[in-house]
């Protein structure tokens, strides 16, 4: 649990301070702003890196009942409200999913967690940790209102956002026909959960279509792995096959959306696709237990963010599919075929080796677009958040 605590402290700090620029980065932005037609993109403190940190922190709360993890997420959403819930891209919708997760905790519903906590330095004991025991009644009321406002803001933006000809959400308005794997974990979990919990059939269908369209048009038939994305208008597939984070985005999108799919036929088809993709991904597990930045690049650099997202997606599926209305068969098939306990343990150990002083290293830098994958590795929020979430949930899974 010391590892999870150290990662939690890092994530709690990063979710409050990211992005922060070095002096060198500030100079670069200043120079770029002086070039006609070149304006640096505005910094976004509420984008997907921060939301991934929040997801990891909520997983840490589940594993060890760490009050600082829960307060960090609540404080993050409060800062987002203070800024007026800015939503520039589909990335920001992940905050809506985070708000629904926190709302479930505050209401004491199905998402309330029982944490394994250390008692007086002895072996861990299971105890019910009440959110109301951390937040006072006034705070609970304040945060419930905050969560509802955040969710409403995301739903309103999603309903008004420009769509492709087939009614899907492009990743960026500059390319209105481009569909990215990244968006599957940004749009679908929010749309599917909102649709079920708020009775909005149109958003439920949008979340499902976003997933099924990519399964039909964004995959490499031979390997069963995704391209980074595709052009809806001409059908061209872009990026590399089997980019590690693209696989992670897809698996996360499916794992977090499926529990809220209400049609049995649709659930079965998507759950089967999840199991098949997971099986193909683990065919490329490295000898050291991890995953490369591009899965097939076995002698290339390991990428802790790919490892964290893939591991987190599996751990979330194990947790979330218990809430689904229908039986899950593909998880059982995957576990039988892939010696899952052994391979997930190997992945867990590989992830732990990336951690130095509470920070996850060997994380690939931010992707700049289709086929733009800088070979720069270090410690980034998407590595810290996803590894924290994976290790937290997997440690709890083992204890259970």
Specify the residue positions occupied by each region the protein language model found:
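CBM-like carbohydrate-recognition segments
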Residues: 2-51, 59, 63, 79, ...
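Short, contiguous, pocket-lining structural segments
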Residues: 45, 179-186, 199, 206, ...
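Alpha-helical scaffold segments in carbohydrate-active enzymes
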Residues: 59, 79, 153-160, 186, ...
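Inter-helical turn/loop segments and adjacent helix faces that build the functional surface
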Residues: 64, 109, 194-205, 257-268, ...
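Extended ligand-binding groove/face enriched in aromatic
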Residues: 71, 82-112, 135-231, 237-240
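Ser/Thr/Pro-rich low-complexity tandem-repeat tracts
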Residues: 111-112, 116-120, 124, 128-141, ...
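Oxyanion-binding "anion nests"
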Residues: 249-295
């Amino acid at each position: 649990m010391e590892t999870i605590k150290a990662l939690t402290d890092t994530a709690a700090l990063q979710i409050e301070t990211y992005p922060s620029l070095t002096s060198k980065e500030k100079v670069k932005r200043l120079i770029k702003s002086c070039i006609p037609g070149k304006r640096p993109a505005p910094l976004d403190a509420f984008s997907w890196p921060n939301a991934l940190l929040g997801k990891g922190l909520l997983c840490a709360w589940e594993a060890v009942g760490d009050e600082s993890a829960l307060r960090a997420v609540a404080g993050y959403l409060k800062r987002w409200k203070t800024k007026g819930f800015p939503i520039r891209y589909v990335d920001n919708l992940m905050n809506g999913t985070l708000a629904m997760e926190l709302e479930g905790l505050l209401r004491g519903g199905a998402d309330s967690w029982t944490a394994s906590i250390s008692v007086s330095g002895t072996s861990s004991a299971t105890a019910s940790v009440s959110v109301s025991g951390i937040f006072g009644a006034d705070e609970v009321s304040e945060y419930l209102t905050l969560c509802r406002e955040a969710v409403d803001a995301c739903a309103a933006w999603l309903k008004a956002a420009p769509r492709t000809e087939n009614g899907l959400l492009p990743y960026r308005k500059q390319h209105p026909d481009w569909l990215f794997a990244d968006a599957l974990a940004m749009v679908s979990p929010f749309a599917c959960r909102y649709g079920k919990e708020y009775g909005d059939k149109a958003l439920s269908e949008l979340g499902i279509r976003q997933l099924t369209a990519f399964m039909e048009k964004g995959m490499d038939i031979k390997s069963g792995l995704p391209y980074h994305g595709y052009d809806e208008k001409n059908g061209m597939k872009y990026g590399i096959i089997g980019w590690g984070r693209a696989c992670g985005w897809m698996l996360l999108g499916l794992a977090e959306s499926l529990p809220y799919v209400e049609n049995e036929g649709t659930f079965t088809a998507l759950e089967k696709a999840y199991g098949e993709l997971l099986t193909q991904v683990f065919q490329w597990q490295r000898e050291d237990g991890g995953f490369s930045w591009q899965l097939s690049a076995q002698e290339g650099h390991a990428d802790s963010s790919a490892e964290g997202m893939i591991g987190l997606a599996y751990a979330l599926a194990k947790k979330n599919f218990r809430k689904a209305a229908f039986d899950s068969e593909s998880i059982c098939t995957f576990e039988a075929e892939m010696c899952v306990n052994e391979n997930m343990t190997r992945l867990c150990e590989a992830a732990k080796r990336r951690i130095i002083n509470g920070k996850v290293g060997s994380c690939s830098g931010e992707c700049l677009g289709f086929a733009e994958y800088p070979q720069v590795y270090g410690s980034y929020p998407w590595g810290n958040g996803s590894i924290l979430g994976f290790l937290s949930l997997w440690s709890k899974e083992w204890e259970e």
